[in-house]
């Protein structure tokens, strides 16, 4: 009689076959994403073609490293291992790596992020800041060793000598590049002496330029209070930094030209033109005034000038007489008031009171002067005492009394415990110094 297997035994046997089959340990598979619903952690969906479907699992760590978002109906190429799930007897593929079919992962990530940021309004024209016409200092965020900074310096120096360039040395590709770009954009915005920023690098592959497609870089440029000119890659290269920047330049030279829209030559020509226009306007004004003066000089009043001031002379005479009479009246009134005041003072004995107060003031003055003299003598004595104390601490005066000062390695020696045999010492005396070598050390208290 034949032995019958249980479902469990058969399933375990098949699972063992799946697990040990080398062809199923690493499977290269292409298919269309189906039944995809994005989850917070692991992703579960199906891969299908025209004739078949297989369940797929992608762990959270793998999905996080994809660099693009899976979408329903997207065709992808995956690498993974096939496994059997015993409870249901179904098999699935555990995906270890995936990329879009027919388009690079970075290109897809670029399009997805561009779509997202466009929907959020990052690239709208209303957020663009105007570039200043005149600048005194330009910040440049790029590699210190590339051709970008050299081209910018050369172009700015040619167009408007005197404009300063402040370089923020920055890693522009590879791990950590995006973080450096963001940090330097924020550093530049903390300064008060910059007029605008140029952010850029030379050409390269999409991988080389990828730092300027990172969302954190787009966010930093969008939040910049300084106007930003983007100059990333060659003319045919386009990054998300170009879309969010206030202006995009195809080359570093073009970026420098945008930063200095008016050259020094343009400015000087404008000044000369304004000077000429002002000069011509002044000449016309002078000519008009001269014609007016000539016309006025031919009038009747200027041919008989005495008629111009006769009336004023008469008015002056009248005012003079009025003033003299007024002064006489006021002087007479003042004399009468003085007589009355003199009489009142004599009757009130005010003079006696004034003299008494003058005596009291004189006495107070003498006391004050005496007190000030005592204070001065006391302060002078304290000063002289302090001066003597300070002079007693003067090293040069101590040495002059016959003492010497010993130094070791230019440091003052205060005890024999600081000295060992063979040390080189300097002995300073009032009329010179000795350089000596210690032959022996003895400890003795004075």
Curated annotation (Swiss-Prot):
Q: Which domain of life is it from?
A: Bacteria
Q: Where in the cell is it found?
A: Cytoplasm
Instruction: Respond yes or no to whether keyword Oxidoreductase is given for this record.
Output: no
GO cellular component terms?
cytoplasm; exodeoxyribonuclease VII complex
Q: What is its EC number?
A: 3.1.11.6
Q: Which GO terms describe its molecular function?
A: exodeoxyribonuclease VII activity; nucleic acid binding
Which key words tag this protein in UniProt? Cytoplasm, Exonuclease, Hydrolase, Nuclease
**Catalytic reaction equation(s):** Exonucleolytic cleavage in either 5'- to 3'- or 3'- to 5'-direction to yield nucleoside 5'-phosphates
Catalytic class of the enzyme = hydrolase
Q: Which GO terms describe its biological process?
A: DNA catabolic process
Coiled-coil annotated residue ranges, if any:
none
Presence of keyword Cytoplasm:
yes
PANTHER family listed in its UniProt record? EXODEOXYRIBONUCLEASE 7 LARGE SUBUNIT
Per the similarity annotation, which family is this?
Belongs to the XseA family.
What the protein does comes down to: Bidirectionally degrades single-stranded DNA into large acid-insoluble oligonucleotides, which are then degraded further into small acid-soluble oligonucleotides.
Subunit:
Heterooligomer composed of large and small subunits.
Per its record, how is this protein called by name? Answer: Exodeoxyribonuclease 7 large subunit
Top-level taxonomy: Bacteria, Bacillati, Bacillota, Bacilli, Lactobacillales
Underlying gene: xseA
């Amino acid at each position: 009689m034949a032995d019958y297997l249980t479902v469990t035994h058969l399933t375990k046997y098949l699972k063992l076959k799946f697990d040990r089959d080398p062809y199923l340990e690493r499977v290269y598979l292409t298919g269309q994403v189906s039944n995809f619903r994005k989850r917070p952690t692991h992703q579960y969906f199906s891969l299908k073609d025209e004739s078949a479907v297989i369940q797929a699992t992608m762990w959270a760590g793998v999905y996080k490293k994809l660099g693009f978002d899976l979408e329903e109906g997207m065709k992808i190429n995956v690498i993974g291992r096939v496994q059997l799930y015993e409870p249901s007897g179904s098999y699935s593929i555990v995906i270890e790596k995936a990329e879009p079919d027919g388009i690079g992962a970075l290109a897809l990530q670029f399009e997805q992020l561009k779509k997202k940021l466009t929907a959020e309004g990052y690239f709208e024209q209303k957020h663009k800041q105007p570039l200043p016409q005149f600048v005194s200092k330009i910040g440049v965020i790029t590699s210190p060793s590339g051709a970008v900074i050299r081209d910018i310096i050369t172009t700015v120096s040619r167009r408007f000598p005197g404009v300063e360039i402040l370089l923020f040395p920055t890693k522009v590709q590879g791990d950590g590049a995006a973080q450096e770009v963001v940090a330097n954009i924020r550093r530049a915005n903390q300064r008060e002496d910059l007029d605008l920023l140029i952010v850029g690098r030379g050409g390269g592959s999409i991988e080389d330029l990828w730092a300027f497609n990172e969302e954190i870089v787009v966010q930093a440029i969008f939040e910049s209070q300084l106007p930003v000119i983007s100059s990333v890659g060659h003319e045919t290269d386009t990054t998300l930094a170009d879309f969010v920047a206030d202006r995009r330049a195809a080359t570093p030279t073009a970026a420098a030209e945008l930063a200095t829209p008016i050259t020094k030559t343009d400015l000087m020509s404008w000044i000369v033109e304004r000077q000429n226009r002002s000069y011509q306007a002044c000449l016309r004004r002078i000519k008009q005034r001269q014609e007016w003066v000539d016309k006025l000089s031919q009038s009747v009043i200027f041919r008989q000038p005495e008629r111009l001031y006769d009336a004023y002379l008469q008015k002056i005479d009248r005012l003079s007489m009025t003033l003299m009479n007024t002064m006489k009246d006021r002087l007479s009134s003042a004399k009468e008031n003085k007589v009355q005041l003199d009489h009142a003072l004599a009757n009130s004995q005010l003079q006696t009171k004034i003299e008494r107060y003058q005596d009291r003031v004189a006495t107070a003055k003498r006391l004050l002067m005496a007190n000030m003299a005592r204070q001065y003598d006391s302060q002078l004595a304290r000063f002289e005492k302090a001066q003597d104390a300070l002079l007693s601490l003067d090293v040069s005066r101590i040495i002059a009394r016959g003492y010497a000062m010993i130094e070791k390695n230019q440091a003052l020696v205060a005890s024999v415990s600081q000295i060992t045999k063979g040390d080189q010492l300097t002995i300073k005396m009032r009329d010179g110094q000795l350089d000596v070598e210690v032959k022996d050390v003895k400890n003795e208290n004075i």
